[in-house]
Amino acid sequence: MAGPNGDPHVLGGGTGDEGDEGGDTFEEEEYAAINSMLDQINSCLDHLEEKNDHLHICLKELLESNRQTRLEFQQQSKQLNTGADVQGSQPPA
């Protein structure tokens, strides 16, 4: 477990074999807890990466759709302007 400053607790050196075994068990449990937390963080990051990839694809599709719409509006505008120019240059009947 981490201390108040985020530093890992370091057990003081024991004088007997029994203290050392307890320290080893504590370290193993701490490493197992850290590994579990890292696995959870990794899983969350994978999930965020998938969401980011999905959003990136959606935004690219939206951008392409907007480009197509803009081109269509430009073509329609040119056709309307060309039609108005042709009608405007003809003498009234």
Curated annotation (Swiss-Prot):
The keyword Lipoprotein does not apply. Residues 17-26 have a biased composition (Acidic residues). Pfam families: UPF0184. GO terms for molecular function: molecular adaptor activity. GO terms for biological process: intermediate filament bundle assembly. One of its GO terms (cellular component) is cytoskeleton. It is found in: Cell junction; Cytoplasm, Cytoskeleton. Keywords: Cell junction, Coiled coil, Cytoplasm, Cytoskeleton. Residues 1-26, 74-93 are annotated as: Disordered. Residues 59-80 form a coiled coil. Its main location: other. It comes from the Eukaryota. PANTHER family: BUBLIN COILED-COIL PROTEIN, UPF0184 PROTEIN C9ORF16. Belongs to the UPF0184 (EST00098) family. Essential for intermediate filament organization in intestinal cells, interacts with intermediate filament and regulates intestinal lumen morphology. This is Bublin coiled-coil protein. The gene is BBLN.
